A protein has these predicted regions:
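Aromatic- and glycine-rich beta-strand/loop motifs that create alpha-glucan
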Residues: 1-33
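Junction motif at the cytosolic side of a transmembrane helix
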Residues: 2-3, 225-244
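Helix-capping/transition residues at the boundaries of transmembrane alpha-helices
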Residues: 19, 89, 101, 174-175
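Membrane-helix interface segments
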Residues: 25, 105-107, 111, 179-184
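Secretory targeting signals
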Residues: 26, 34-86, 111-177, 213-223
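Central hydrophobic cores of alpha-helical transmembrane segments
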Residues: 29-35, 180-194, 209-211, 228
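Helix-loop-helix units of permease transmembrane domains in multi-pass membrane transporters
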Residues: 86-119
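Extracellular/periplasmic helix-loop-helix junctions in multi-pass membrane proteins
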Residues: 198-219
Length: 244
């Protein structure tokens, strides 16, 4: 019986992750994130479209510009939270949480929502980078050096961690305020607030500014990811306890 319950619980978690990665909001966020990354390339994108003869960028060069571009980084918090950050609050408010907890158990419902939110934020960033790479390759008709180096892989990993962090923060803010819009606006406002603090008041604290997370601080990002997931679980427990 315990094994059956465990299997049912794991299926519930997998179901939440699948819903997070296949829902319409994930696809909307994927298109928006890809567009933001493309706009972050700037003048290199113009040269790409004009098919300039002296175009010398490799695929890694272009994707690194996209991943580190200000526009892509400024939109990252809200877009990362878009696919699934408000889902837990929605289920709690509409009463669907009762039947979900009855089927899978409270613990598995909580883990499913936390996993779906975090994984969707991370996968979104990787998928957008992959889609942009395909678009850039297609625009050049295959006439581009397909060089993917270690620097790109590390930068993409950092961006994925940022996506997971902001998605978790969005879920926490939505549950804390009991407002769905806080899932998207909350991470964006927090990001801008930290940017202002870092630039104006604590310039020496480089990693206080989220824009700089993409350039380093791997251990810090892993720690923030862990803390954000734990906070998410705490608020999910509180939310489900009040309504179930």
């Amino acid at each position: 019986m315990t094994a059956a319950l465990g299997t049912k619980g794991m299926k519930a978690i997998a179901c939440d992750v699948r819903r997070a990665l296949t829902g319409r909001w994930f696809w909307a966020a994927l298109l928006a994130t890809t567009a933001a990354l493309y706009l972050s390339i700037g003048q290199a994108a113009d040269a790409l479209m004009e098919d300039a003869e002296n175009f010398w960028f490799t695929l890694s060069d272009l994707l690194l510009m996209a991943l580190r571009g200000d526009f892509g980084l400024l939109t990252l918090p809200a877009l990362s939270a878009l696919p699934f950050a408000a889902q837990a609050l929605h289920e709690i408010k509409c009463g669907a949480v009762r039947s979900a907890v009855f089927r899978a158990g409270r613990r598995m419902w909580i883990l499913g929502k936390a996993a779906g939110c975090t994984v969707s934020g991370m996968v979104l960033q990787a998928a957008a980078a992959g889609l942009l790479g395909l678009i850039l390759y297609a625009v050049r008709g295959g006439n581009i050096l397909l060089e993917i180096n270690a620097e790109f892989n590390l930068t993409l990993l950092r961006r994925m961690l940022c996506g997971g962090i902001w998605a978790s923060v969005g879920c926490v803010m939505a549950l804390a305020t009991e407002t769905s819009s806080a899932a998207y606006l909350g991470p964006l406002c927090l990001c801008y607030a930290l940017m202002m603090l870092g630039k104006r008041f604590f310039p020496a604290a480089v990693m206080l500014n989220p824009i700089n997370w993409i350039d380093g601080g791997d251990g810090m990002l892993a720690g923030l990811e862990s803390v954000s997931i734990l906070l998410q679980i705490v608020f999910l427990k509180r939310g489900v306890r009040e309504y179930v």
